[in-house]
């Protein structure tokens, strides 16, 4: 027992002794009042620089102490280490004086540069030269005053040839981007003086006209332009130059007018010959980033910013030519992919995958970084063959096996190196990472641990039980880690941990001052054993920073390892067979310290050395040669001819002999007993098999190269139920997201225009989706109590809980706010226990996170305040039941944030409609049993919308609000409701929606209520409608005819048919009048998709339709049916195809596509020359039945989607995305400063009657691609900037339409009162309205709201008259009633002022100068020398001048009165009566008598002195009445003038004396009545 006690005592003493002798590194700490902005090491040095509070400090002892640099006297905004010279660094200021050191910070000198002024917009950037470090460029952006960094800013470059020893010189070119050819160590391009620059030429509009690439060997004293084919200087925009390894990449934006355009990359190895890479990447929403590359391959990521919540990237790698790229990995979460240092081909990446169990808790740090709450999980994978294969990361833990769906997932696996970059560490395969084991990365940071790998990331072990930031020293033999907790509230680190055995064991060391770690670093090459830990203290009251210097130099007594302490480490060993994998034809070996060896490598500033071991050549060491590509069908390394490449290589050649494979550039494999022929075969190719036949046809150059058309096929389970394009921004070209719902209740999303689709990972049954008016807004409706909300076009969805299930009694589930994405109204159903259900409205202002009940028993609600021009933004209208026992609907208004009860606006309504900035309410007048229309423009005041007198709308009659885009409301009122024979009247309102007139009768509609009415996009006032020609029959089959209006519904004509069909044959009815032979088109009511319109808003003047030529419209299946095209707004037409075709416009009309809509097909037809010629293109190997053809709603894209029935399974659908993006070799040149030399021309719509270009009172000019310029695309060119309003035209009959209660007589084109109504009826109707005090005498015409005509013929003279008994209000309104204070101000105030002035003048100027007696002695013709008034000051001088002027004036007046007495008094009376007897709203003209008294000789012949316009005029007393002469530009209107009063032609000239005054009075008429 005693012996046992002794043993325990010995053991305890030994343990205590071991604790007291445990190694602790040397630690020192420096306290600072604020944290450092930047901290960096000089390479191969113990010296580092720190930027803190605009002061630059230096430490020469690995951070143990710091001192300010005395040579620097100015505030420093940033500093930069020179990668070409490890002794040099630069410190930049906000002045012309900058600082440079060339001895690692010991001494600093200044250099001056004209770089900074008030317009500089960015931090200056230095461009380095690896061959001659003294050659440097420095640049900054200079922007127009008050503007941020944008396209209008100029990039200013300065250069030095002596390392800034002399003042830098400005480059002589205004470059956009400049790069040295020797921007990398391995570049073989050019020489040390070679500089590449891009230069953009702008016009006065700020548009890029040309983009050039130049090089120079003398800093642009001379320059040479580099021509890149097919990149023309006028096409696209060069946005960047990259030098990566020995590759030079020129990155260009395909559409220079769109910053989110597709990009192209042109690659060169000599800087002279460039070839376009097949990098067909849509980076419309993202950024291209180049990753560490090699001489054998370029690597890059494309960050996809399509999702604002969860950003992913795609990872691409090229072949050794840099021309052919392969997507190696998709959905890289946050772009988090990292190459393992020192090991070729090794990468670790985090991948975003759809989560089946979305996290609904509070956001953690990871949630903010990676969007953890957005139904995405993160899975980590590793590749050891340059991304060709990826596998889950193996954890050496028996409880976590990959086959059990468990692996290691890493949040971070990088350290901050001495240069300030994040790297995996300069070690021989030793890595550290923070993460967790399981199916995916944890969403909470505190669940993560720290793991270590010793085989380059293939397998891992747990190192620490908490997450940590870390750094490596002595090639990984010293590891320092500081705990870092990612909770919202977390404790500061009180310890740090270190390992001296490559992460196998760890020791803990206390920190004197706990910190939140900000940085931990060591020397750049990771060979030092000294570390720096920087962080802020845990006090919330201050931001003190502590910098710890930790020194492990004395560990193991500083022993240096011997040969026996090293082992051979072979990289890239496979998990399967433990054999090393060959990459680039070699294996990699490292000589590293054994894990348990107690010594250090101790080779300070010596990088890790790689031992290369060549491998036997295999198929993997070869790649496809020029003209070939990897086969998509074969899994092996099989290369097949590439039609795209060969079409370029075969130019002017008939045959090619090419090797199908080549050895990868830089590959080090050993051929051994193999021969080159064992891997490569020489192929002979006939160019005729690969070159488009039409491509070389000089007679038909208009169809592009069909080899550039790409087809992408996607298969879906279930039939198509719903699809919609979703815009991502206000940019008209950004609607590339497509949402598809199938009949099996699944939803698929594409964010690349239909090239690929991803299924939304929602297990709930999806009933449908709604797309809001705000870009990106999509909401999925499910059969559960959940909805899924997206604001990024469906890239991510947030799960929200709804208060109730959607109501089947409401025709929609959601009403959106027009401007605020977080607001919408939910319509749900709430049922009681007795089964009685009500439809309720619920409102949210936080995108569905919470809901509040808005109103019960609703039929629908809308945010009307957001659409009305002058309405309250929070105003909401709801139509709801008056009571549960009453089925009548009432209209209620309420405020979103108000607690007040809803206000009842109308007691009994049918419904309401929002039309542009109007709200139209259909109310029921119970007394008259009729339907009334009420209109509001502010949501508060409603006005009666009066229908024509002869149209009584019954409560059961349907009316449809069609359009309001032309400052008037178009409405269709059904007048015949007999099934299958429905039609009605097309009504049009005045500008405020209160008076409706008949625009067209017998307009066709269908049973559902849709109307054959199409407003043509892009053309003012052009409308196409179908009418029922046999309306009187009232039964049977409708005979439809198509009419077109070019003046907003005022006049209608039939469509003029083409003379011959598409086969050059005449039509049977050719030669007959239009009423027997016209073009008729199938309209809105017959479309499968109502979004398929005749026209396109971007393809101005283009219309396509299906129809026939004849007397009436024939059925679709009739043999006469064909497809027709118009390019001049419907004036002329041509037949383009026999049969029924679906059509779409692309690229603003430069691409037209047709697909057979009836028969199965495997081809489409396209035209690139505005429909002049058409080409057939086979898009599938078998025939399919096309259901729809679609593109973005703006018709500006070059991608089209065909929705088709799956040929193998008719229950499923397929999409064929036809991509014409590359069919044009260039972008059309737009130069508004020199329009004669670009690719556009002006086009004006021409009125079919008269042939003039005046439409709505003005001549407009629109830009279109010029005829014959069919080799270019438009893209986002701002053609609207070139729009010209050439002139305002004189008014003609075409600028007027019939006034309220007037109707157009088609026989003579005049407006007549509706049947059964007289002028007296009009007075009665208008005066019977509530609060009415005036009515108007109408001429029968009113100006079309769109018209801007001036002068010319005036048809619309409005004359206000008082309603009976309302004369007083009328006079007050027009300012004729003077009383009260008005009378005081108008009479007494001026009288008082006048009397005071007279008294003052009398006292100072008359009385003291002798009174009136003295003034009477003044003679007009005598000098005033005898009159010397008193003038003591300046006031006396002024007064005396007034007196003298008054004397002269009185004298003249007396003489004038005496003369006028001789004129006949009767004539004066008549003149006075006419002059002063003016009516409001009437023109001011003069009535002249025809007789004179005997004293007329006093003035000679009176008539001789009149204006020539009044010569020989004959007037009488009745001339005072206003008469409106109608002189039409069309002969038919003469009839109307004959039916009215006979007016003397000479009166017509007098009628136009004072047009401006009449316009002012008409404005007065439109003012509201006084209350």
UniProtKB/Swiss-Prot annotation:
Keyword Membrane: yes
Ranges of Acidic residues composition bias in the record: 1553-1562
Residue intervals annotated with topology Cytoplasmic: 1404-1571
Keyword RNA-binding: no
Signal peptide span: 1-22
CC terms in the record's Gene Ontology section: cytosol; Golgi apparatus; membrane
Stretches forming BNR repeats: 451-461, 497-507, 788-797, 842-852, 1124-1134, 1165-1175
The protein, known as: Vacuolar protein sorting/targeting protein 10
Organism the protein comes from: Candida dubliniensis (strain CD36 / ATCC MYA-646 / CBS 7987 / NCPF 3949 / NRRL Y-17841) (Yeast)
Lineage, broadest ranks: Eukaryota, Fungi, Dikarya, Ascomycota, Saccharomycotina
Protein's gene: VPS10
